[in-house]
């Protein structure tokens, strides 16, 4: 099975977007 760069970038986006939002929410909560 061949992994293309587009698949890698999609996986990274899917992984990073929730982490980014949880960081933003955490900063808002701990003000």
Curated annotation (Swiss-Prot):
One of its GO terms (biological process) is photosynthesis. The keyword Plastid applies. The chain crosses the membrane at residues 7-26. GO terms for cellular component: chloroplast thylakoid membrane; photosystem I. It comes from the Eukaryota. SUPFAM superfamilies: Subunit XII of photosystem I reaction centre, PsaM (SSF81548). Keywords: Chloroplast, Membrane, Photosynthesis, Photosystem I, Plastid, Thylakoid, Transmembrane, Transmembrane helix. It is a single-pass membrane protein. It is found in: Plastid, Chloroplast thylakoid membrane. Belongs to the PsaM family. This is Photosystem I reaction center subunit XII.
């Amino acid at each position: 099975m061949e992994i293309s760069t587009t698949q890698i970038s999609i996986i990274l986006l899917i992984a990073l977007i929730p982490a980014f939002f949880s960081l933003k929410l955490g900063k808002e909560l701990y003000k």
